[in-house]
Each structure stands twice: as structure tokens, then as C-alpha cells.
Amino acid sequence: MSRIRSALALVALGLSAVAGHAQTSPAISTIVAFSLSNPVGNLVQGADGALYGVGRPATSIPGAVIYRAALDGSDVRTLYQLKPDDALSPAGGLVLASDGLLYGTTKFGQAGQIDSAGSIFKIAAAGTGFQIIHRFAPVTASNQDLNPINTNGAYPEAELVEGADGYLYGVARAGGPNGTGTIFKISRDGTDFKLLHSFAAVTSSTTSGLTVTVDGAAPTGPLVASTDNFFYGTTSQGGANGRGVVFRIAFDGTGFQVLHEFSA
């Protein structure tokens, strides 16, 4: 298959089971390909059955889009193109909340703000009502690994998840008082933002330059809500070996615990 430069391909996977619990190789078909640099995050299926996602330019310039695509590729449309005064670089996929709106994050804030740390937005599936509901606090300093420090988190790169209480929960890769990332919750209207956990300060670095902390650093994947009333997640760095950890935290923000530290 020829490589499509600066394009997004939505694929359909056909899986066929055979006797003996074996499976044939997935049949992969491109249902639509269109010019869009750096599609990011997961797709989410809306109430109308269509797929919704985000994409951003190759650089941190305005032009990122929120788009909709029919399952068969017959209807692909841009719902909204982010403006310089909105935010830059959508970093995770969208989540469809119980209010029927789509929510997402951006890695940076408004164009031209060098201390920006990202934002959270919402938009209707019809492409109307785009709104920034939260801007993360400005960056005020950096830690020993040159990661940004602020009060509540910076560079959210993972999809949000909605809790049973209707709040949205997420992680920020950096920021917080130690620059190693945070776990947060926010009401859908953006009026109530709470910091649930700030990852610990950097204690040292490994010989290969990995960040060592007591409880993880740089969470980049989404949280998973479990039936035991805990969120589970991972960090890409930190822990005793600097290779990241698996953690959990209760829905109310208590009981943070490292479950596993990945080995060196």
C-alpha cells in the first residue's frame, strides 16, 4: 500500500473466526483518506453512529480541526477549525459525555502565549457551540528535567473520561508543583476544576537519562474507570527505575497507590 503523506486513513477491520478458536488475519480497508496532518487520539462514535476525531498541523500553528466521518466514508466534514484565540494542538481524542457533547484537550493555549499549558474544550456533534471551558495555569518555572511547573498541570495529552458523577477526569503530562504531571477532574461546564494528585518531584535520573520519582511521572494515557470505584492509569516515566508505573486512585481523589513499577 502506498504511503499517504499528511493524510488520515480511517480503517475497518474484518475479523473471521475459524474452528479451533483460530483467527484469520484482519482484513484492512481504507474507507476514507483526506489531507490532514497528524491525526491524534482515538476516534469516538457519536449517537448518530458517525466517527468523530481531531487532527492538528505538523507544527504548533493554528489550523487544527475537529471532524466527523460516516462509517462507510461517504460523508466526511470539518466541524470546527480551531482559531489562534482558541488553542493549539489537540492532544487526545474526544469523549462523548452524557450531555451529548464532545469534550477534548489541547496541549497548548492561545497562539503567541509562550507560558501556555493547554486547555479543555467542548463542542456539539453538529459542530456548534465550541467553547474553551478551562485553561491550565500559566507556566511559571521548570524543574531539573526542564519540564514546566505551574499550579494545576500542563500539556494534557490523553482523552478525558466521564465519571459516574458527571465530572470529566484526566491527566496532564507535565506541570503541577513538581513539573511531573497531575491528575484532575472538572465539571462539564468548567466551573469546578479540582486537582486530585500531583506526581512527586524528581529525585534523580538514571544513567540513560530517565526520570526517577517515587510515584511516577509524565502520564500520557487515559484513565480507566473500574467497577471497584478506582481509576487506573500509567505514567511513561518515573518510578524507581524511571520506566513508568501503573497506578490507581479512588474516584474521590483519595487512595493514590502505585501498583507496579516497570523494570530497567
Where are these regions (language model features)?
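Extracellular beta-propeller repeat domains
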Residues: S2-A264
